[in-house]
Amino acid sequence: RIAIAGVIAMEPECIVLDEATAMLDPAGRREVLDTVHRLNRERGITVVLITHHMSEAEDADRVIVMNDGTVAMDGTPCQVFSRVEELHAFGLAAPDTVELLYELRQAGLPVALDSLTVDQCADTICRALGAAEGK
């Protein structure tokens, strides 16, 4: 947190954070991510966030998955996280909401894998169950 404060004081155009939330408790992780989002929104600072936690990338404009030094996936969070099997092949997991929808799809419920928030996920499940009842 102190290192991030020092970088902010220099007023950069771009900040690169490599595993910035590693070793932080959930509250500390949220605080760092909120600060990063605020810097991007309010000051227009470009933020490159390097993380193994896919949930930290949910709010990004763009997600790039690297594998052995090459770009394996590149797109919006919805585009990348909906490719659950490919993420698994790289040893990564999609956000919990997408993983839940993926499991429901595997069980036969026709759901899209594009819900990143809990509310979106709940709406997707309710719509799918409502459609299934209507049959």
Model-derived segments and spans:
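A short, proline-enriched helix->beta-strand linker immediately N-terminal to the Walker B motif
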Residues: 9-13
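ABC ATPase "signature
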Residues: 74-75
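ABC ATPase nucleotide-binding domains
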Residues: 87-135
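Helix N-cap at the start of a conserved alpha-helix in ABC-type nucleotide-binding domains
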Residues: 26-28
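Catalytic Walker B motif of ABC-type/P-loop ATPase nucleotide-binding domains
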Residues: 15-18
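Conserved H-loop
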Residues: 44-50
